[in-house]
């Protein structure tokens, strides 16, 4: 068994040929201008109580008015640390950290600290970034993103292994007897490629602990999942984000929307079972409803859907 498979968050969330469910947070509502921290915590605790396996937050360092109305976006490490204080079992994930815009030392220390504080519940989705206005703000050469992403991932592995690693690369050098004072319990934290992150699939299969992708038409996803699992040397989970506009009518038929579906809970269950049948291992649901309360959505899915996809016993 690898060190990753000993990680508590990984063990509860992932198992070959089994599916578990998570939620995208912070929640937002078109009916309310702002959902405060106390309500976010209430929803997180409700999700944990009802058997959801994870909560995933986004990382967008900058906002631009050209993006239009977007969900409030807190610093992912600060927000997840806050949530960790009010939850005990649910995995805490990022979807995803823009790895190319953060210094590896800061990133290694923040993630190690959160993983320890949360009792090894952190799942790190790692992205290259796709907002062109962010790269000049951080003085990052967009043409070098492929190499910078690889260097960051390799640097994190080294920084988590030892208190005094010897590292020399294009981003930083660490020659003296120095390193992180606090290391993760397992000397590693699960990291997941996001999309292709400007890499080949083979690089992701070799260097990442799993793959976080975007919802695809079913047959396309089936081919992608098969290609992913067939090229890894051990079980490395495949997961995706799925947009859901959940009807109050449990029998409503399926209507495709961007990144997911509008449907009732009965067809949603069948959709998720189909994803499980092709060895999708985790799905992060993101509610898009503008006609229902968040609490009611979590309650309905948690009552009728999550019991079919329970967290794995540690």
Where are these regions (language model features)?
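Short, acidic/polar
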Residues: 34-47, 110, 193-203, 261-275
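Catalytic domains of carbohydrate-active enzymes, especially glycoside hydrolases
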Residues: 41-58, 205-214, 274-281
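Active-site mouth loops of central-metabolism enzymes
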Residues: 25-37, 97-105, 187-196, 252-266
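Hydrophobic faces of well-ordered beta-strands that scaffold small-molecule active sites
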Residues: 21-25, 55-57, 92-94, 122-126, ...
């Amino acid at each position: 068994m690898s060190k990753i498979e000993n990680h508590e968050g990984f063990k509860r969330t992932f198992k070959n040929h089994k599916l578990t469910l998570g939620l995208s947070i912070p929640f937002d509502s078109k009916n309310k201008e702002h959902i405060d921290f106390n309500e976010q915590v209430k929803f997180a605790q409700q999700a944990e109580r009802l058997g959801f396996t994870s909560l995933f937050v986004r990382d967008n360092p900058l906002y631009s008015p050209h993006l239009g109305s977007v969900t409030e976006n807190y610093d992912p490490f600060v927000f997840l640390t806050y949530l960790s204080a009010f939850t005990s079992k649910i995995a805490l994930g990022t979807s995803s950290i823009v790895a190319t815009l953060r210094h590896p030392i800061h990133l290694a220390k923040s993630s190690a600290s959160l993983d320890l504080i949360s009792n090894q519940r952190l799942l790190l989705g790692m992205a290259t970034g796709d907002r062109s206005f962010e790269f000049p703000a951080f003085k990052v050469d967009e043409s070098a993103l492929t190499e910078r992403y690889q260097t960051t991932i390799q640097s994190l592995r080294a920084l988590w292994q030892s208190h005094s690693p010897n590292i020399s690369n294009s981003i930083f050098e660490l020659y003296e007897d120095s390193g992180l004072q606090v290391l993760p319990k397992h000397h590693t934290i699960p990291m997941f490629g996001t999309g292709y992150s400007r890499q080949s699939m083979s690089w992701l299969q070799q260097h990442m602990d799993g793959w976080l992708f975007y919802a695809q038409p079913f047959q396309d996803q089936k081919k992608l999942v098969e290609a992913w699992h067939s090229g890894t040397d051990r079980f490395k989970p495949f997961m995706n984000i799925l947009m859901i506009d959940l009807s109050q009518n449990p029998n409503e038929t399926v209507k495709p929307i961007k990144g997911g579906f509008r449907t009732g809970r009965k067809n949603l269950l069948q959709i998720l079972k189909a994803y499980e049948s092709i060895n999708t291992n985790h799905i992060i649901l993101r509610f898009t409803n503008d006609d229902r309360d968040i609490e009611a959505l979590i309650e309905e899915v948690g009552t009728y859907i999550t019991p079919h996809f329970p967290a794995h016993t540690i």
